[in-house]
């Protein structure tokens, strides 16, 4: 048998082994791992390319390790059966052997350890009131997350909360921010997952990670699994996609079905900027699909106000409304960038000032200095380097600072981007 034939046979056998392993058909899995390893060793013997040899060696080590664990497990299981038989005959013998599941438990512990970092221990401290607009989305999440925990008696006799919610919309509209609010308000175990947490270079490990994730969520319910950029894990099927990608998708489908069968307690919360690329079967598992649109004028005004926060400013509510009118088509992220640029203007005024004047600060009850025009009657010539830093009073933000920032910062989305989301909402979604 030629080297390419040996390698293809080895890959075919190891895929069968992994399928049996995932299905917990351990005797068959062990047998196929052994056969696959024989063919891998033959391929290694005839392979001339050093790089290819190294790849094959790493695979041999991985599958050999798994086969050894299965061997220990199967031997211990046989010992337990024999032990039970001896007990039934009145001959009890002590044993120092590990428990039957110890070999497999060590593998599960390793996977769980990799997922532990995804559990949010410290809450993000984002409240519903910190999010401007998106009232429909907030109400849907409260209905799904908070009410079943606070009023469990209402969710019986066929009344069940949603087990899958998809948040979709253009980038920067607040999908991840909503998830942070859920994590803060829910008081549930919160798993924050990205593709890097679940994708492994080792064959078969990615789907085992997915399975362990859902098992951990069920054990620690009420729990929420938040998957950001879920399209990177569960995109539409195509001829060109990898076997690994197909396996991850299949495992997600199986586990999300399992969530539904396992009654309430586990919510899968997905977020994506490109919902039309999701696999249709995955899309169906998200029973509630909520569009997170660009903010309206009222929400934009509130965003300006929230982003300015406690920074000293002269802006009025009317100024915030005026800025909202000027930023039609801006996302929440765009507005955040506008504010970040605007609040640097007082710093720039200090940095470029050639004249300062003395002012009395009521808060500290002392005289400070602040930048001013050279024509100011109280002005004295100086740069910020010649002034005691502790004596400089920060100039207040003005609406002109924001006008300047809006001119510099352009929206990141165009009409074509919005149209795609609008069409998807007509076909599959609901307004947020």
From Swiss-Prot:
Q: Which GO terms describe its biological process?
A: endosomal transport; late endosome to vacuole transport; mitotic nuclear membrane reassembly; protein transport to vacuole involved in ubiquitin-dependent protein catabolic process via the multivesicular body sorting pathway; vacuole organization
Q: Which CDD domains match?
A: MIT_VPS4 (cd02678)
EC number(s) on record?
Answer: 3.6.4.6
Domain of life of the native organism? Eukaryota
Q: Where is the MIT domain?
A: 3-80
Family matches, as InterPro entries: AAA+_ATPase, AAA_lid_3, ATPase_AAA_core, ATPase_AAA_CS, MIT_dom, MIT_dom_sf, MT-severing_AAA_ATPase, P-loop_NTPase
Query: Could you tell me where the Polar residues compositional bias lies?
Result: 83-100
| Residue ranges crossing the lipid bilayer per the database entry | none
Sorted alphabetically, the Gene Ontology cellular component annotations on this record are: cytoplasm; cytosol; endosome membrane; nucleus
Protein name as catalogued: Suppressor protein of bem1/bed5 double mutants
Organism name? Schizosaccharomyces pombe (strain 972 / ATCC 24843) (Fission yeast)
What is the name of the gene encoding this protein? vps4
């Amino acid at each position: 048998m030629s080297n390419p034939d040996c390698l293809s046979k080895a890959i075919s056998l190891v895929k069968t082994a992994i399928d049996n392993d995932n299905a917990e058909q351990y005797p068959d899995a062990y047998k196929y791992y052994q056969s696959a390893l024989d063919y891998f060793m033959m391929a290694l013997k005839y392979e001339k390319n050093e790089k290819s040899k190294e790849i094959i060696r790493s695979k041999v080590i991985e599958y050999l390790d798994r086969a050894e664990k299965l061997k220990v497990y199967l031997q211990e299981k046989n010992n337990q059966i024999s032990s039970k038989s001896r007990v039934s005959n009145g001959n009890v013998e002590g044993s120092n052997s590990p428990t039957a599941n110890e070999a497999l438990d060590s593998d599960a512990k390793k996977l769980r350890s990799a997922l532990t970092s995804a559990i949010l221990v410290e809450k993000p401290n984002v409240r519903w009131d910190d999010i401007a607009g998106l009232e429909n989305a907030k109400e849907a999440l409260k209905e799904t997350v908070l009410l079943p925990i606070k009023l469990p008696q209402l969710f019986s006799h066929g009344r069940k909360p949603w087990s899958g919610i998809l948040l979709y919309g253009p980038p920067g509209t607040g999908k991840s921010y909503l998830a942070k609010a859920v994590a803060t308000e829910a008081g549930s175990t919160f798993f924050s997952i990205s593709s890097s947490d679940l994708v492994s270079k080792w064959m078969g490990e990615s789907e085992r990670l997915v399975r362990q994730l859902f098992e951990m969520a069920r054990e620690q319910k009420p729990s929420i699994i938040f998957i950001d950029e879920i399209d990177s894990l569960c995109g539409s099927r195509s001829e060109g996609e990898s076997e690994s990608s197909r396996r991850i998708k299949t495992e997600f489908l199986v586990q999300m079905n399992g969530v539904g069968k396992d009654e309430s307690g586990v919510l899968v919360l997905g977020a994506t900027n490109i919902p039309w690329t999701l696999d249709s079967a995955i899309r169906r598992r998200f029973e509630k699909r909520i569009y997170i649109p660009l903010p309206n004028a009222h929400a934009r005004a509130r965003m300006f106000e929230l982003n300015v926060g406690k920074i000293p400013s002269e802006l009025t509510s009317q100024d915030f409304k005026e800025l909202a009118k000027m930023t039609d088509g801006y996302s929440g992220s765009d507005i955040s960038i506008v504010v970040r640029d605007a609040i640097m203007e007082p710093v720039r005024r200090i940095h470029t000032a050639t004249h300062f004047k003395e002012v009395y600060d009521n808060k500290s009850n002392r005289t400070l200095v602040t930048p001013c025009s050279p024509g100011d009657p109280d002005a004295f010539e100086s740069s910020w380097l010649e002034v005691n830093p502790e004596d400089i009073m920060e100039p207040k933000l003005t609406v002109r600072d924001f006008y300047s920032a809006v001119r510099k910062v352009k929206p990141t989305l165009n009409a074509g981007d919005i149209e795609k989301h609008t069409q998807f909402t007509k076909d599959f979604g609901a307004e947020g």
